[in-house]
Amino acid sequence: MTTIVSVRRNGQVVIGGDGQATMGNTVMKGNVRKVRRLYNDKVIAGFAGGTADAFTLFELFERKLEMHQGHLTKAAVELAKDWRTDRMLRKLEALLAVADENTSLIITGNGDVIQPENDLIAIGSGGPFAQSAARAMLENTDLGARQIAEKALTIAGDICIYTNHNHNFEELPSKA
């Protein structure tokens, strides 16, 4: 799987991810870009799960953003509705972490849209490790969002065999 982490702090929101793609217990590629910008660079998103499934979801989510003039929550809810009701989409196995300047959300394959506590998201196989590390740093340091995301991904990569140390990040200014 993978690790995606999103942190919002001090006027910044960042989503970072590792670059490992696996098939079973074999590493197939080490530099997959799982984090990207959407909707005229106003939304950042990361995926955990099947790569082909995630690219399909990115494309569908970007269409929803276009339909709803960039309104993140509305687009996420509409994607989740489609994901839940469309027979083909239900077979897709991926999670999305998405953020704009105001909101951070998790969109699940079950059709759920979750606004996380403390604006901290960590998904994928290394998610629990990254979340624990990031939460400790949020509560006990003055580090910025990018530094926290970097360190959380590094810790997850040290522990989770499906997460590597080839990281990619996208950042936006945050109003939240």
Curated annotation (Swiss-Prot):
Its EC number is 3.4.25.2. Its main location: cytoplasm. Na(+) binds at G157, C160, T163. One of its GO terms (molecular function) is metal ion binding. It comes from the Bacteria. Keywords: Allosteric enzyme, Cytoplasm, Hydrolase, Metal-binding, Protease, Sodium, Threonine protease. It is found in: Cytoplasm. It catalyses: ATP-dependent cleavage of peptide bonds with broad specificity. GO terms for biological process: proteolysis involved in protein catabolic process. Allosterically activated by HslU binding. The active site is at T2. It is an enzyme of class 3 (hydrolase). One of its GO terms (cellular component) is proteasome core complex. The keyword Membrane does not apply. NCBIfam families: ATP_dep_HslV, PRK05456.1. Protease subunit of a proteasome-like degradation complex believed to be a general protein degrading machinery. A double ring-shaped homohexamer of HslV is capped on each side by a ring-shaped HslU homohexamer. The assembly of the HslU/HslV complex is dependent on binding of ATP. Belongs to the peptidase T1B family. HslV subfamily. This is ATP-dependent protease subunit HslV. It comes from Photorhabdus laumondii subsp. laumondii (strain DSM 15139 / CIP 105565 / TT01). The gene is hslV.
